[in-house]
């Protein structure tokens, strides 16, 4: 039998499917590279998930022997394995880097990235140059994952291992919240950059303006280039990159200094020899490597011979102990530029004292000089960073506390509100970056809900105003980092009340009516609940006017946040620059309106059919920004009909482009202009997949189905941030 790797193997006559990207089959993308990508709306469905459908991770986590798990992790830290020995006999620094790099891909611009789904296990993250040799860290964790199984996700385990690592070396932490649920394949919705080569940097324009929503400076890096911008060893220029990158992760200067200094208090960088000795990353490794990458032929290929970043050495003389020696060395010595054995820029101390030599990674009796990266020296030579770093140097307890808080924020920022946290170590303290919301202490009976709906419908507010306000409040939700949503009613507060898309004057009028209703009620009901209930009442009325007597499921329990609980700068990133559901776009972008609609739908957690039915329903309900007529293909505005779809696919009309990206819908016989539309509207007739959904909802026998599906999708958005209730309860079936 011939070796399967030989090039002269016979061609299989029965292999008709496309099973690799290297297939010689031509795909739709090859023919039509600009084709709309709807696949990001259908990720992580049941077909990829090996768990039973009834599996509930939160319930499994509650069965976990949490303290036994932490003890097993603590023991692992010093149980060095021959196949990948621990530097200094302690795996702590490796696990800190693993946890940091899991959480550190998060960016505030779109809330994507981060450690909440365990995607460091998959491409591209598992093969990023900045994640080199973290595959070894995950393999070291496997016996513990195997032991505790479904009770602890990979996502939670990686972060918890980082916490235990810090604690095992004398560092301070302030707690841990579980609840990160694994996905089972890569997140294809995340834009990591346009570069086609690792460590390429094509994401800047103008005066080093970083492309949105990216945070990292180069393809395949978590943060910044440790050698300096584009590999140039300039600490001051590096500080500029650091500040912008960490800002885009939601970190201020103090948190940035604490994280860099705290992380570099531990461990070492690895650059024992030239990178030419290092094999391919995990995704490119041969099958016999079994998912391990970066296998090195330099020396033993491990221990003191390891090659990772190319920079070589520890930062401190005590690399497995929490102390203040990082700042002491940073400020007490002058630093001279040099190169590592791998040829990377780094800095060495001038006139180093013997007591400040670091131990060798394998033999504590052998001493080697410590080093600093260009990005470390940025903390000394940038004026603002220097003030903070020197204060931490002079106040070690303040530094320890600042690091613990910044670490908790780093590892939990993408988890959403505190109500999602699980486990016995959840801190009691609320942090403003968690977007805290007061809990409510009232319940509403069905009769009370009906009375309130009647008050709202008799208040003088229109169906359009009620629907618009509810949508504006709820559609801020981002499933990426679980921020936004109707809970908290932050639409009353800065900055949301002043966003252009929310039509501030009209919004103020609607909120004033809700406040009047709230005062008149015999019991306290939150504005957040009233806004959602008002939208639901309007949808019910619109459905009744269309001939369908329906109840829109409503679950009270939302609280009203205060301005003091709302970080204006942090919430500003949630402002929509486009919302196709309201036919709104702030200005022209390089990306088409239809693509921005799909991105918005993905952030809301919607499927393609849900996106379709919501757009069609919101158009006829009059939810467009400033009542623009585009896409309102009906003569019965405010009535929940399928008219949008009926008229969209009607061949009696033709679609003619005009100026400003607007299209006219004309009668083919008379030339009469019936309606106008945007690309967002027309894509549901132009894209073959979306047209199939549009035709489905345009069918005569699917009018009722359209109403039911619209309500289910509407309720899904209204309850997207209700982590205190079960999703299946929120999506109870609609009876018509």
From Swiss-Prot:
Positions of crosslink type Tryptophyl-tyrosyl-methioninium (Trp-Tyr) (with M-249): 100-223
Positions with a binding annotation for heme b: 264
Pfam short name (any one): peroxidase
Entry GO terms, CC: cytosol
Cofactors: heme b
Biological processes per GO annotation: cellular response to hydrogen peroxide; hydrogen peroxide catabolic process
Residues flagged as site, Transition state stabilizer: 97
Documented EC number(s): 1.11.1.21
GO molecular function terms listed in the Swiss-Prot or TrEMBL record: catalase activity; heme binding; metal ion binding
Residues forming the catalytic site: 101
Keyword terms of this UniProt record: Heme, Hydrogen peroxide, Iron, Metal-binding, Oxidoreductase, Peroxidase
Post-translational modification: Formation of the three residue Trp-Tyr-Met cross-link is important for the catalase, but not the peroxidase activity of the enzyme.
Signal peptide bounds: none
Cofactor details (free text): Binds 1 heme b (iron(II)-protoporphyrin IX) group per dimer.
Cross-link Tryptophyl-tyrosyl-methioninium (Tyr-Met) (with W-100) per UniProt, renumbered positions: 223-249
UniProt keyword Iron present: yes
Coiled-coil regions listed in the entry: none
Catalytic reaction list: H2O2 + AH2 = A + 2 H2O; 2 H2O2 = O2 + 2 H2O
Function: Bifunctional enzyme with both catalase and broad-spectrum peroxidase activity.
NCBIfam families: cat_per_HPI, PRK15061.1
Family: Belongs to the peroxidase family. Peroxidase/catalase subfamily.
Complex formation: Homodimer or homotetramer.
Family matches, as PANTHER family: CATALASE-PEROXIDASE (PTHR30555:SF6), HYDROPEROXIDASE I, BIFUNCTIONAL CATALASE-PEROXIDASE (PTHR30555)
Protein name according to UniProt: Catalase-peroxidase
UniProt source species: Geobacillus kaustophilus (strain HTA426)
Taxonomic path: Bacteria, Bacillati, Bacillota, Bacilli, Bacillales
């Amino acid at each position: 039998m011939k070796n399967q790797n030989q090039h002269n193997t016979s061609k299989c006559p029965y292999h008709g499917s496309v099973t690799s990207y290297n297939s010689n089959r031509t795909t739709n993308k090859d023919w039509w590279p600009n084709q709309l990508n709807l696949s990001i709306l259908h990720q992580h469905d049941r077909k990829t998930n090996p768990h039973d459908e009834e599996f509930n991770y939160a319930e499994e986590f509650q069965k976990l022997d949490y303290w036994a798990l932490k003890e097993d992790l603590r023991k692992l830290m010093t149980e060095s394995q021959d196949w990948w020995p621990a530097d200094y006999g302690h795996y702590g620094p490796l696990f800190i880097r693993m946890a940091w790099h899991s959480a550190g891909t998060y960016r505030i611009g779109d809330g994507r990235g981060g450690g909440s789904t365990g995607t460091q296990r998959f491409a591209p993250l598992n093969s990023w140059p900045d994640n080199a040799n973290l595959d070894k860290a995950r393999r070291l964790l496997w016996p513990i994952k195997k032991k505790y199984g479904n009770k602890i996700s990979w996502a939670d385990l990686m972060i918890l291992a980082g916490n235990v690592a810090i604690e095992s070396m004398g560092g301070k932490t302030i707690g841990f919240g579980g609840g990160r649920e694994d996905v089972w394949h890569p997140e294809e919705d995340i834009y990591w950059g346009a570069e086609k080569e690792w460590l390429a940097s094509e994401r800047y324009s103008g005066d080093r303006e970083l492309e949105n929503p990216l945070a990292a400076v180069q393809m395949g890096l978590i943060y910044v280039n440790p050698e300096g911008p584009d590999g140039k060893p300039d600490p001051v220029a590096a500080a500029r990159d650091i500040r912008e990158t960490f800002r885009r992760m939601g970190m201020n200067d103090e948190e940035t200094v604490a994280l860099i200094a705290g992380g570099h208090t531990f461990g070492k960088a690895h650059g024992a020899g030239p990178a030419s000795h290092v094999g391919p990353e995990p995704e490119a490794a041969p099958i016999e490597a079994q998912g391990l990458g970066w296998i090195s032929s330099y020396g033993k290929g491990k221990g003191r011979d390891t090659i990772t970043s190319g920079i070589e050495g520890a930062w401190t003389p005590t690399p497995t102990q929490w102390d203040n020696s990082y700042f002491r060395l940073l400020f007490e010595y002058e630093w001279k530029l040099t190169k590592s054995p791998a040829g990377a820029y780094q800095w060495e101390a001038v006139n180093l004292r013997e007591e400040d030599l670091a131990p060798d990674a394998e033999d504590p009796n052998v001493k080697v000089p410590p080093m600093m990266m260009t990005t470390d020296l940025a903390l000394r030579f940038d004026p603002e960073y220097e003030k903070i770093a020197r204060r931490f140097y002079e106040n070690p307890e303040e530094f320890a506390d600042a690091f613990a808080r910044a670490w908790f924020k780093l590892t939990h920022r993408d988890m959403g509100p505190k109500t999602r946290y699980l486990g016995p170590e959840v801190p009691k303290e609320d942090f403003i970056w968690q977007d805290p919301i007061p809990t409510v202490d009232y319940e509403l009976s069905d009769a009370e809900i009906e009375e309130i709906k009647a008050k709202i419908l008799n208040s003088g507010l229109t169906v359009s105003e009620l629907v618009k306000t509810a949508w504006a409040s709820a559609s801020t939700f981002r499933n990426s980092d679980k921020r936004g949503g109707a809970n908290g009613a932050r639409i009353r507060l800065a900055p949301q009340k002043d966003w252009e898309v929310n039509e501030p004057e009209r919004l103020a009028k609607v909120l004033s009516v809700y406040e009047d209703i709230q005062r008149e009620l015999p019991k306290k009901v939150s504005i957040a609940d009233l806004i959602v209930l008002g939208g639901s009442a309007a949808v019910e009325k619109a459905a009744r006017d269309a001939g369908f007597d329906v109840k829109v499921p409503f679950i009270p329990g939302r609280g009203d946040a205060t301005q003091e609980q709302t970080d204006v700068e942090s919430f500003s990133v949630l402002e929509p620059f486009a919302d196709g559901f309201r036919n709104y776009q702030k200005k022209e972008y390089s990306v088409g309106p239809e693509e921005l609609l799909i991105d918005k739908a993905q952030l809301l957690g919607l499927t393609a059919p849900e996106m379709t039915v919501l757009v069609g329903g919101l158009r006829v309900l009059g939810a467009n920004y400033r009542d623009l007529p585009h896409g309102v293909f009906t003569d019965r505005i405010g009535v929940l009909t399928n008219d949008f779809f009926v008229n969209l696919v009607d061949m009696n009309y033709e679609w003619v482009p005009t100026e400003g990206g607007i299209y006219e819908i004309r009668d083919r016989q008379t030339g009469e202009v019936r309606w106008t539309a945007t690309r967002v509207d027309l894509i549901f007739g132009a894209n073959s997949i979306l047209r199939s959904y549009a035709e489905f909802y345009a069918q005569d026998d699917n009018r009722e189905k359209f109403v039911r599906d619209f309500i289910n999708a509407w309720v899904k958005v209204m309850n997207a941030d209700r982590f205190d209730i079960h999703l299946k309860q929120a999506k109870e079936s609609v009876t018509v």
